[in-house]
Amino acid sequence: SAIQYSNGLWGQYVGKSLFGLTYRSGYRQEPADQLNTSLSIEQQLPFIQGLSIKGVINYDPYRVKKKKYLTPIPVYTLDASQTPYQYMEGFQGPEKPNLEQSFEESVSMTYQGMINYSRTFGKHTVTGLGVIEARERNVWNMSAKRLNYNINIDEINAGSSDPADISNGGTSWKERQVGYAFRLGYNYDNRYMAEVSGRYDGHYYFAPGKRFGFFPAFSLGWNLREESFMKDLIWMDKLKLRLSYGESGNLAGSSYQYM
């Protein structure tokens, strides 16, 4: 099959024209605006050595406009059984132009508050961390679609007035989650280490009364390389043993499946 006949008509192969799909099929636009901002403040507390607090706020707005305009691509096959030859017309894609437009806007916010402690007493080092975090996301969107345009004007109000060719939609939703976390650590002479941590998280995915879960973890460590009986092993510069255990949650699935 010819890509293009001598009279300028587009050829096709099994009903498709790659050239026509590239240059005559319409367009798709998705311009988007996104801003990621973060503000943090940290302060050492002078009345307790090694104690500090920190606050973080993230503000992330996002906006996207989508517009998809599909136009018919006429393709032709040559019928050599007739005299003179006849060109048989077909279409790739819709037989009349279609237009689909949508708009979505979202705002994501994250709030964090932290208190941190770290201090060494001789050979003993004690650390502690407490965190509270809240996240929220608000989303709005709307869409409109028109089929079977009789005029080649790519605007919603220029589309068909037949109810079967019209569809509109829109929705909005909110996402929320909150978490509390802690970590306590102890280190003796960089040889013996212990750490206990945990999270208490809540997420909007789950049914009221079952949205929160506690996830603990602990670890023990032994830095053998710092022991006196290892000092002469110059060919080994690091050797540690560690035992740890932890639990974590799972956000598999999607929101409101409990309904």
Where in the sequence are the language-model features?
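Surface-exposed extracellular loop regions of Gram-negative outer-membrane beta-barrel proteins
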Residues: 237-259
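Transmembrane beta-strands of outer-membrane beta-barrel pores
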Residues: 57-65, 132-138, 198-204, 224-226, ...
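Short glycine/threonine-rich loop-to-helix capping motif typified by GTGT followed
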Residues: 208-212
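Outer-membrane beta-barrel transmembrane strands
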Residues: 15-68, 98-120, 127, 139-141, ...
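Surface-exposed loop/turn segments flanking beta-strands in extracellular/periplasmic regions
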Residues: 1-16, 72-95, 138-168, 257-259
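Short coil turns and loop connectors of transmembrane beta-barrels in diderm outer membranes
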Residues: 47-49, 122-124, 136, 190, ...
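Feature captures outer-membrane beta-barrel proteins of Gram-negative bacteria and organelles
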Residues: 185, 214-222
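Outer-membrane beta-barrel signature, preferentially recognizing the C-terminal barrel domain
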Residues: 161-181, 247, 259
